[in-house]
Amino acid sequence: MEIILGVVMFTLIVLALTVMILFAKSKLVNTGDITVEINEDEDKSFTAPAGDKLLNMLSSHGIFVSSACGGGGSCGQCRVTIKEGGGDILPTELSHISKREAKEGCRLACQVNVKQNLKIELPEEIFGVKKWTCEVISNDNKATFIKELKLKIPDGDVVPFRAGGFIQIEAEPHTVKYADFDVPTEYRGDWDKFNLFRFESVATEPTVRAYSMANYPEEHGIILLNVRIATPPPSVPDAPPGIMSSYIWSLKPGDKVVISGPFGEFFAKDTDAEMVFIGGGAGMAPMRSHIFDQLKRLHSKRKISFWYGARSRREMFYEEDFDQLQAENDNFRWHVALSDPQPEDNWTGYTGFIHNVLLENYLKDHPAPEDCEFYMCGPPMMNAAVIKMLKDLGVEDENIMLDDFGG
Protein backbone atom coordinates (compact mmCIF):
# COMPACT_ATOMS: atom_id res chain seq x y z
CA MET A 1 0.00 0.00 0.00
CA GLU A 2 2.81 2.42 0.87
CA ILE A 3 4.45 1.75 -2.51
CA ILE A 4 1.22 2.50 -4.38
CA LEU A 5 0.68 5.66 -2.34
CA GLY A 6 4.25 6.77 -3.10
CA VAL A 7 3.78 6.22 -6.84
CA VAL A 8 0.53 8.20 -6.78
CA MET A 9 2.14 11.09 -4.89
CA PHE A 10 5.12 11.14 -7.26
CA THR A 11 2.80 11.19 -10.27
CA LEU A 12 0.76 14.04 -8.80
CA ILE A 13 3.92 16.06 -8.12
CA VAL A 14 5.14 15.56 -11.71
CA LEU A 15 1.76 16.58 -13.09
CA ALA A 16 1.67 19.66 -10.85
CA LEU A 17 5.15 20.71 -11.97
CA THR A 18 4.20 20.19 -15.63
CA VAL A 19 1.12 22.38 -15.22
CA MET A 20 3.22 25.08 -13.52
CA ILE A 21 5.81 25.03 -16.31
CA LEU A 22 3.16 25.24 -19.02
CA PHE A 23 1.45 28.10 -17.17
CA ALA A 24 4.73 29.98 -16.78
CA LYS A 25 5.56 29.42 -20.45
CA SER A 26 2.19 30.80 -21.49
CA LYS A 27 2.89 33.95 -19.50
CA LEU A 28 6.55 34.44 -20.39
CA VAL A 29 6.70 33.30 -24.02
CA ASN A 30 4.42 34.67 -26.70
CA THR A 31 3.41 31.65 -28.76
CA GLY A 32 0.78 33.54 -30.75
CA ASP A 33 1.22 36.19 -33.40
CA ILE A 34 3.39 39.25 -32.93
CA THR A 35 3.60 42.51 -34.88
CA VAL A 36 6.80 43.88 -36.36
CA GLU A 37 6.42 47.62 -36.94
CA ILE A 38 8.97 48.96 -39.43
CA ASN A 39 9.92 52.64 -39.74
CA GLU A 40 6.53 53.60 -38.24
CA ASP A 41 5.02 52.67 -41.60
CA GLU A 42 1.94 50.43 -41.63
CA ASP A 43 2.55 49.42 -45.25
CA LYS A 44 5.98 47.99 -44.34
CA SER A 45 4.89 46.37 -41.05
CA PHE A 46 3.61 42.81 -40.71
CA THR A 47 2.21 40.19 -38.34
CA ALA A 48 3.83 36.76 -37.94
CA PRO A 49 3.98 33.81 -35.52
CA ALA A 50 6.37 34.39 -32.61
CA GLY A 51 9.52 32.36 -32.08
CA ASP A 52 11.57 32.80 -35.26
CA LYS A 53 14.72 34.85 -35.80
CA LEU A 54 14.09 38.41 -36.98
CA LEU A 55 16.28 37.88 -40.07
CA ASN A 56 14.12 34.94 -41.18
CA MET A 57 10.90 36.82 -40.44
CA LEU A 58 11.98 39.76 -42.56
CA SER A 59 13.07 37.49 -45.41
CA SER A 60 9.77 35.58 -45.41
CA HIS A 61 8.00 38.92 -45.86
CA GLY A 62 10.15 39.98 -48.80
CA ILE A 63 12.55 42.19 -46.84
CA PHE A 64 16.08 40.98 -47.51
CA VAL A 65 18.68 42.24 -45.04
CA SER A 66 22.31 41.64 -46.01
CA SER A 67 23.87 38.64 -44.25
CA ALA A 68 27.07 37.39 -45.87
CA CYS A 69 27.42 34.53 -43.36
CA GLY A 70 23.87 33.33 -43.95
CA GLY A 71 22.64 34.15 -40.45
CA GLY A 72 25.47 32.58 -38.48
CA GLY A 73 26.30 35.74 -36.54
CA SER A 74 29.88 35.96 -37.84
CA CYS A 75 29.72 38.71 -40.49
CA GLY A 76 27.93 41.42 -38.50
CA GLN A 77 26.11 42.77 -41.56
CA CYS A 78 22.45 42.22 -40.65
CA ARG A 79 22.21 45.30 -38.46
CA VAL A 80 18.84 46.70 -37.52
CA THR A 81 17.78 49.30 -34.97
CA ILE A 82 15.26 48.02 -32.42
CA LYS A 83 13.24 50.76 -30.77
CA GLU A 84 11.00 48.51 -28.69
CA GLY A 85 11.10 44.78 -27.82
CA GLY A 86 13.86 42.36 -28.75
CA GLY A 87 15.19 41.62 -25.27
CA ASP A 88 18.80 42.06 -24.15
CA ILE A 89 21.71 42.07 -26.58
CA LEU A 90 23.47 38.68 -26.78
CA PRO A 91 27.20 37.99 -26.26
CA THR A 92 27.41 36.81 -29.89
CA GLU A 93 26.52 40.35 -31.01
CA LEU A 94 29.01 42.26 -28.86
CA SER A 95 31.99 41.55 -31.11
CA HIS A 96 30.21 43.44 -33.91
CA ILE A 97 28.32 46.12 -31.99
CA SER A 98 29.92 48.77 -29.78
CA LYS A 99 28.48 49.84 -26.43
CA ARG A 100 27.36 53.13 -27.93
CA GLU A 101 25.61 51.35 -30.81
CA ALA A 102 23.97 48.92 -28.39
CA LYS A 103 22.56 51.82 -26.36
CA GLU A 104 21.07 53.19 -29.58
CA GLY A 105 19.28 49.88 -30.19
CA CYS A 106 21.58 48.35 -32.78
CA ARG A 107 21.16 44.56 -33.03
CA LEU A 108 21.99 41.71 -35.41
CA ALA A 109 18.74 40.48 -36.95
CA CYS A 110 20.05 36.91 -37.15
CA GLN A 111 20.48 36.81 -33.36
CA VAL A 112 17.17 38.36 -32.30
CA ASN A 113 14.64 35.67 -31.37
CA VAL A 114 11.28 37.40 -31.75
CA LYS A 115 9.02 36.64 -28.76
CA GLN A 116 7.11 39.92 -28.51
CA ASN A 117 5.96 42.86 -30.59
CA LEU A 118 8.83 44.82 -32.14
CA LYS A 119 9.36 48.34 -33.37
CA ILE A 120 12.39 48.51 -35.66
CA GLU A 121 14.09 50.86 -38.09
CA LEU A 122 15.64 49.79 -41.40
CA PRO A 123 17.49 51.83 -44.05
CA GLU A 124 15.17 52.72 -46.91
CA GLU A 125 17.49 51.15 -49.51
CA ILE A 126 16.76 47.70 -48.07
CA PHE A 127 13.27 47.86 -49.55
CA GLY A 128 14.80 47.92 -53.03
CA VAL A 129 16.43 44.52 -52.51
CA LYS A 130 14.79 41.69 -54.48
CA LYS A 131 15.23 38.02 -55.39
CA TRP A 132 15.83 36.58 -58.84
CA THR A 133 16.08 33.06 -60.19
CA CYS A 134 18.97 33.20 -62.65
CA GLU A 135 20.35 30.76 -65.20
CA VAL A 136 24.01 29.79 -65.41
CA ILE A 137 25.49 30.95 -68.73
CA SER A 138 29.03 29.75 -68.05
CA ASN A 139 31.26 28.71 -65.16
CA ASP A 140 34.88 28.63 -66.34
CA ASN A 141 38.27 28.59 -64.64
CA LYS A 142 40.10 31.90 -64.82
CA ALA A 143 42.91 30.70 -62.53
CA THR A 144 43.86 27.48 -60.73
CA PHE A 145 41.42 28.03 -57.87
CA ILE A 146 39.12 30.74 -59.29
CA LYS A 147 36.08 30.34 -61.51
CA GLU A 148 34.14 33.06 -63.27
CA LEU A 149 30.42 32.39 -62.81
CA LYS A 150 28.23 34.21 -65.33
CA LEU A 151 24.50 34.32 -64.55
CA LYS A 152 21.65 35.45 -66.80
CA ILE A 153 19.08 37.74 -65.20
CA PRO A 154 15.45 36.94 -66.19
CA ASP A 155 14.39 38.77 -69.36
CA GLY A 156 13.03 42.22 -68.65
CA ASP A 157 14.49 42.41 -65.14
CA VAL A 158 17.26 44.73 -63.99
CA VAL A 159 19.48 44.47 -60.92
CA PRO A 160 19.97 48.15 -60.00
CA PHE A 161 23.44 47.81 -58.49
CA ARG A 162 26.37 50.19 -58.13
CA ALA A 163 29.96 49.32 -58.97
CA GLY A 164 31.54 47.66 -55.94
CA GLY A 165 28.25 46.15 -54.79
CA PHE A 166 27.49 42.53 -53.99
CA ILE A 167 24.71 39.97 -54.17
CA GLN A 168 23.80 37.01 -52.00
CA ILE A 169 23.53 33.59 -53.58
CA GLU A 170 21.51 30.70 -52.18
CA ALA A 171 22.24 26.97 -52.16
CA GLU A 172 19.81 24.23 -51.24
CA PRO A 173 21.00 21.17 -49.27
CA HIS A 174 23.35 19.18 -51.48
CA THR A 175 26.34 16.87 -51.76
CA VAL A 176 29.18 17.95 -54.05
CA LYS A 177 32.05 15.70 -55.06
CA TYR A 178 35.23 17.51 -56.11
CA ALA A 179 35.99 14.58 -58.42
CA ASP A 180 33.09 15.80 -60.58
CA PHE A 181 34.53 19.31 -61.04
CA ASP A 182 35.41 20.39 -64.56
CA VAL A 183 39.02 21.60 -64.12
CA PRO A 184 40.94 22.26 -67.38
CA THR A 185 44.21 20.41 -67.93
CA GLU A 186 46.35 23.55 -67.52
CA TYR A 187 45.13 23.91 -63.91
CA ARG A 188 44.99 20.27 -62.83
CA GLY A 189 48.65 20.07 -61.74
CA ASP A 190 48.11 21.78 -58.38
CA TRP A 191 44.81 19.96 -57.88
CA ASP A 192 46.58 16.62 -58.26
CA LYS A 193 49.60 17.78 -56.26
CA PHE A 194 47.45 18.66 -53.23
CA ASN A 195 45.04 15.75 -53.77
CA LEU A 196 42.06 18.10 -53.85
CA PHE A 197 39.77 15.87 -55.90
CA ARG A 198 39.26 13.68 -52.80
CA PHE A 199 37.06 16.26 -51.06
CA GLU A 200 33.30 16.26 -50.74
CA SER A 201 31.07 19.06 -49.52
CA VAL A 202 27.82 18.17 -47.76
CA ALA A 203 25.18 20.79 -46.93
CA THR A 204 22.28 19.58 -44.81
CA GLU A 205 20.42 22.89 -44.79
CA PRO A 206 20.05 25.92 -47.07
CA THR A 207 23.10 28.18 -47.21
CA VAL A 208 23.47 31.85 -48.15
CA ARG A 209 26.72 33.69 -48.88
CA ALA A 210 27.73 37.07 -50.32
CA TYR A 211 29.90 37.63 -53.39
CA SER A 212 31.10 40.90 -54.88
CA MET A 213 30.11 41.47 -58.49
CA ALA A 214 32.78 41.68 -61.18
CA ASN A 215 30.54 43.28 -63.81
CA TYR A 216 29.71 46.97 -63.91
CA PRO A 217 26.23 48.51 -64.30
CA GLU A 218 26.32 48.84 -68.10
CA GLU A 219 26.97 45.12 -68.57
CA HIS A 220 23.24 44.52 -68.69
CA GLY A 221 21.38 41.29 -68.12
CA ILE A 222 24.15 39.40 -66.33
CA ILE A 223 25.80 38.92 -62.97
CA LEU A 224 29.51 38.11 -63.03
CA LEU A 225 31.26 36.58 -59.99
CA ASN A 226 34.86 35.49 -59.31
CA VAL A 227 34.69 32.55 -56.89
CA ARG A 228 37.72 31.02 -55.22
CA ILE A 229 37.30 27.43 -54.07
CA ALA A 230 37.61 27.24 -50.27
CA THR A 231 39.56 24.04 -49.65
CA PRO A 232 40.68 23.01 -46.14
CA PRO A 233 44.00 24.57 -45.11
CA PRO A 234 47.01 22.19 -45.17
CA SER A 235 47.29 22.48 -41.38
CA VAL A 236 43.72 21.16 -40.95
CA PRO A 237 43.27 18.67 -43.81
CA ASP A 238 40.21 17.04 -42.24
CA ALA A 239 38.24 20.28 -42.01
CA PRO A 240 35.22 20.49 -44.33
CA PRO A 241 35.61 22.52 -47.53
CA GLY A 242 33.59 25.67 -48.07
CA ILE A 243 29.94 24.83 -48.68
CA MET A 244 29.02 27.71 -50.98
CA SER A 245 32.20 27.82 -53.06
CA SER A 246 31.93 24.05 -53.56
CA TYR A 247 28.31 24.45 -54.66
CA ILE A 248 29.18 27.24 -57.10
CA TRP A 249 32.07 25.27 -58.59
CA SER A 250 29.64 22.40 -59.29
CA LEU A 251 27.25 24.56 -61.33
CA LYS A 252 26.90 23.96 -65.06
CA PRO A 253 25.34 25.96 -67.91
CA GLY A 254 21.56 25.80 -67.69
CA ASP A 255 21.44 25.33 -63.91
CA LYS A 256 19.16 27.66 -61.94
CA VAL A 257 20.46 29.80 -59.07
CA VAL A 258 18.60 32.12 -56.68
CA ILE A 259 20.25 35.44 -55.85
CA SER A 260 19.16 38.48 -53.86
CA GLY A 261 20.40 42.04 -53.89
CA PRO A 262 21.80 44.45 -54.60
CA PHE A 263 23.74 45.25 -51.44
CA GLY A 264 26.90 47.20 -50.79
CA GLU A 265 28.96 49.88 -49.10
CA PHE A 266 32.21 49.55 -51.07
CA PHE A 267 31.39 52.41 -53.41
CA ALA A 268 33.64 54.98 -55.07
CA LYS A 269 33.69 58.47 -53.63
CA ASP A 270 32.49 61.25 -55.91
CA THR A 271 35.67 63.34 -55.85
CA ASP A 272 38.53 64.26 -58.17
CA ALA A 273 41.16 62.53 -55.99
CA GLU A 274 43.57 59.99 -57.44
CA MET A 275 42.29 56.41 -57.17
CA VAL A 276 44.64 53.52 -56.34
CA PHE A 277 43.13 50.02 -56.61
CA ILE A 278 44.93 47.09 -54.93
CA GLY A 279 43.77 43.50 -55.39
CA GLY A 280 44.71 39.86 -55.16
CA GLY A 281 43.03 36.53 -55.86
CA ALA A 282 39.25 36.66 -56.21
CA GLY A 283 39.50 40.23 -54.93
CA MET A 284 39.71 40.99 -58.64
CA ALA A 285 35.90 41.11 -58.80
CA PRO A 286 35.15 44.53 -57.25
CA MET A 287 38.35 45.94 -58.78
CA ARG A 288 37.11 45.09 -62.28
CA SER A 289 33.65 46.46 -61.48
CA HIS A 290 35.00 49.78 -60.21
CA ILE A 291 37.65 50.34 -62.88
CA PHE A 292 35.34 49.44 -65.77
CA ASP A 293 32.67 51.72 -64.31
CA GLN A 294 35.06 54.66 -63.94
CA LEU A 295 36.52 54.36 -67.43
CA LYS A 296 33.72 52.89 -69.55
CA ARG A 297 30.55 54.38 -68.03
CA LEU A 298 31.67 57.54 -66.26
CA HIS A 299 34.58 58.29 -68.62
CA SER A 300 36.44 59.52 -65.55
CA LYS A 301 39.48 61.75 -65.99
CA ARG A 302 40.75 60.98 -62.48
CA LYS A 303 44.23 59.49 -62.24
CA ILE A 304 43.69 55.76 -61.71
CA SER A 305 46.12 52.89 -61.14
CA PHE A 306 45.54 49.20 -60.43
CA TRP A 307 48.06 46.99 -58.61
CA TYR A 308 47.30 43.27 -58.66
CA GLY A 309 49.17 40.45 -56.93
CA ALA A 310 49.26 36.86 -58.21
CA ARG A 311 51.41 33.78 -57.62
CA SER A 312 52.37 33.12 -61.23
CA ARG A 313 51.33 33.96 -64.76
CA ARG A 314 48.76 31.17 -64.65
CA GLU A 315 46.91 33.04 -61.87
CA MET A 316 46.51 36.24 -63.91
CA PHE A 317 43.17 36.93 -65.60
CA TYR A 318 41.33 39.73 -67.42
CA GLU A 319 44.80 40.68 -68.68
CA GLU A 320 43.62 41.62 -72.19
CA ASP A 321 40.75 43.71 -70.78
CA PHE A 322 43.04 45.83 -68.62
CA ASP A 323 45.63 46.13 -71.37
CA GLN A 324 42.92 47.53 -73.64
CA LEU A 325 41.69 49.96 -70.97
CA GLN A 326 45.26 51.17 -70.48
CA ALA A 327 45.71 51.69 -74.22
CA GLU A 328 42.46 53.65 -74.47
CA ASN A 329 42.84 55.82 -71.34
CA ASP A 330 45.89 57.99 -70.68
CA ASN A 331 44.81 58.41 -67.04
CA PHE A 332 44.91 54.65 -66.29
CA ARG A 333 47.85 52.34 -65.60
CA TRP A 334 47.83 48.80 -64.29
CA HIS A 335 50.61 46.68 -62.80
CA VAL A 336 50.98 43.02 -61.82
CA ALA A 337 53.45 41.55 -59.32
CA LEU A 338 54.10 37.80 -59.24
CA SER A 339 55.10 36.37 -55.86
CA ASP A 340 56.22 33.00 -57.26
CA PRO A 341 56.87 33.27 -61.02
CA GLN A 342 57.55 29.97 -62.76
CA PRO A 343 60.40 29.38 -65.24
CA GLU A 344 57.93 28.94 -68.09
CA ASP A 345 56.42 32.36 -67.31
CA ASN A 346 59.49 34.18 -68.70
CA TRP A 347 58.36 36.99 -66.41
CA THR A 348 60.20 40.32 -66.62
CA GLY A 349 57.72 42.38 -64.61
CA TYR A 350 57.47 43.13 -60.91
CA THR A 351 58.05 40.30 -58.41
CA GLY A 352 57.24 40.05 -54.71
CA PHE A 353 54.22 40.92 -52.61
CA ILE A 354 51.98 43.60 -54.03
CA HIS A 355 52.13 45.96 -51.03
CA ASN A 356 55.93 46.08 -51.22
CA VAL A 357 55.89 46.54 -54.99
CA LEU A 358 53.37 49.38 -54.71
CA LEU A 359 55.44 51.10 -52.03
CA GLU A 360 58.85 50.72 -53.67
CA ASN A 361 57.77 51.53 -57.20
CA TYR A 362 55.20 54.25 -56.65
CA LEU A 363 54.10 55.44 -53.24
CA LYS A 364 57.49 56.09 -51.62
CA ASP A 365 58.15 58.79 -54.23
CA HIS A 366 54.55 60.02 -54.42
CA PRO A 367 54.30 63.69 -53.41
CA ALA A 368 51.09 63.21 -51.39
CA PRO A 369 49.91 59.60 -50.90
CA GLU A 370 47.66 60.81 -48.08
CA ASP A 371 45.55 62.64 -50.67
CA CYS A 372 44.84 59.49 -52.71
CA GLU A 373 41.84 57.20 -52.30
CA PHE A 374 42.79 53.54 -51.86
CA TYR A 375 40.36 50.76 -52.77
CA MET A 376 41.41 47.20 -51.93
CA CYS A 377 40.15 43.65 -51.93
CA GLY A 378 42.19 40.48 -51.54
CA PRO A 379 43.29 37.76 -49.12
CA PRO A 380 43.28 38.80 -45.43
CA MET A 381 47.09 38.87 -45.16
CA MET A 382 47.33 41.14 -48.19
CA ASN A 383 44.67 43.48 -46.83
CA ALA A 384 46.42 43.73 -43.45
CA ALA A 385 49.83 44.39 -45.04
CA VAL A 386 48.45 47.09 -47.34
CA ILE A 387 46.58 48.85 -44.54
CA LYS A 388 49.68 48.90 -42.32
CA MET A 389 51.76 50.28 -45.18
CA LEU A 390 49.22 53.02 -45.88
CA LYS A 391 48.94 53.96 -42.20
CA ASP A 392 52.75 54.25 -42.05
CA LEU A 393 52.52 56.69 -44.98
CA GLY A 394 50.02 58.83 -43.10
CA VAL A 395 46.89 57.85 -45.03
CA GLU A 396 43.75 58.46 -42.96
CA ASP A 397 41.05 55.81 -42.47
CA GLU A 398 38.58 57.82 -44.53
CA ASN A 399 40.73 57.28 -47.63
CA ILE A 400 41.15 53.51 -47.15
CA MET A 401 38.21 51.53 -48.58
CA LEU A 402 38.19 47.76 -48.00
CA ASP A 403 35.90 45.09 -49.45
CA ASP A 404 36.01 42.08 -47.12
CA PHE A 405 34.07 39.68 -49.37
CA GLY A 406 35.78 39.42 -52.73
CA GLY A 407 39.02 37.86 -51.50
Swiss-Prot record:
Residues noted as binding [2Fe-2S] cluster in the record, renumbered to the chain: 69, 75, 78, 110
UniProt signal peptide: none
Span of domain FAD-binding FR-type: 129-269
Record key words, sorted: 2Fe-2S, Cell inner membrane, Cell membrane, FAD, Flavoprotein, Ion transport, Iron, Iron-sulfur, Membrane, Metal-binding, NAD, Sodium, Sodium transport, Translocase, Transmembrane, Transmembrane helix, Transport, Ubiquinone
GO molecular function, a single term: oxidoreductase activity, acting on NAD(P)H, quinone or similar compound as acceptor
Enzyme Commission number, as recorded: 7.2.1.1
Residue intervals passing through the bilayer: 3-23
Subunit annotation: Composed of six subunits; NqrA, NqrB, NqrC, NqrD, NqrE and NqrF.
UniProt name for this protein: Na(+)-translocating NADH-quinone reductase subunit F
